[in-house]
């Protein structure tokens, strides 16, 4: 099970710039609050990030109309950038090889309809058994994939780049491989070594 932004596609910076552009008119404090939360909560829905901003900046909940408007502005600001984003090094080769051996899934914090549009347009949908996004949380998505297909959690691998991804793996009882730095977890700067990592795992019953 792979996250999308920062795991399959190098799209994290695209979304960081998009977040900044949507709240720039609210001032530098708003930008700082939103980007700090965004960077430390990868894999969390954009709508939850805007809710956090409103609570911190104004001490109240954001109204649904404003939330929807910000979500639409964000989607418009980042869609083309995500469409052009390159693969994370090693990701494309891993996916093409791994799909011949195991069922692959995507679990992302991006709204599901938008995520599927991106994957359809880029010709990626057919590489995966399922492509899933928000509003369900990352933990719910991973648990749902495991339950629906009766997979053994201990034989399921979550590949992510955020503490949200790691928390989802821990909640599900699955293995985890991080893109980036994850103390005490198997991880690397990219996905070029992911297949070797999987091939080095002990076989069931061994």
What is the role of each PLM region?
Residues 1-36:
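Active-site neighborhood of HAD-like aspartate-dependent phosphohydrolases
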Residues 8, 104, 158:
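Conserved SAM-binding loop
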Residues 14, 45, 86, 90, ...:
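Short beta->alpha linker loops
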Residues 20-24, 45-62:
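Helix-loop "lid/cap" segments that line or gate small-molecule binding pockets
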Residues 25-30, 58-62, 123-127, 150-151:
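Short helix-capping segments at alpha-helix termini
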Residues 54-90:
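Metal-dependent phosphoesterase signature
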Residues 76-106, 112, 116, 139-140:
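Short, acidic loop-to-helix structural element flanking the phosphoryl-transfer center
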Residues 112, 116-206:
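Asp-based, Mg2+/Mn2+-dependent phosphohydrolase catalytic module
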């Amino acid at each position: 099970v792979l996250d999308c932004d920062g795991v399959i596609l190098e799209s994290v910076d695209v979304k960081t710039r998009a977040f900044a552009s949507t709240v720039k008119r609210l001032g530098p404090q708003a930008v700082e609050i939103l980007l700090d939360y965004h960077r430390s909560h990868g894999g969390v829905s954009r709508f939850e990030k805007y809710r956090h901003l409103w609570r911190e900046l104004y001490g109240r909940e954001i109204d649904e109309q404003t939330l929807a408007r910000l979500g639409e502005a964000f989607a418009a600001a980042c869609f083309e950038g995500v469409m052009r984003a390159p693969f994370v090094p090693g990701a494309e080769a891993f996916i093409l090889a791994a799909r011949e051996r195991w069922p692959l899934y995507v679990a992302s914090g991006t709204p599901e309809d938008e995520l599927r549009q991106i994957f359809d347009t880029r010709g990626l949908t057919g590489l995966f058994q399922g492509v899933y996004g928000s509003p369900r949380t990352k933990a719910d998505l991973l648990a749902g994939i495991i339950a629906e297909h009766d997979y053994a959690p201990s034989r399921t691998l979550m590949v992510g780049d955020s503490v949200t991804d790691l928390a989802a793996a821990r909640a599900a009882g699955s293995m985890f491989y991080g893109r980036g730095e994850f103390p005490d977890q198997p991880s690397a700067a990219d996905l070029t070594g992911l297949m070797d990592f999987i091939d080095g795992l002990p076989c069931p019953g061994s």
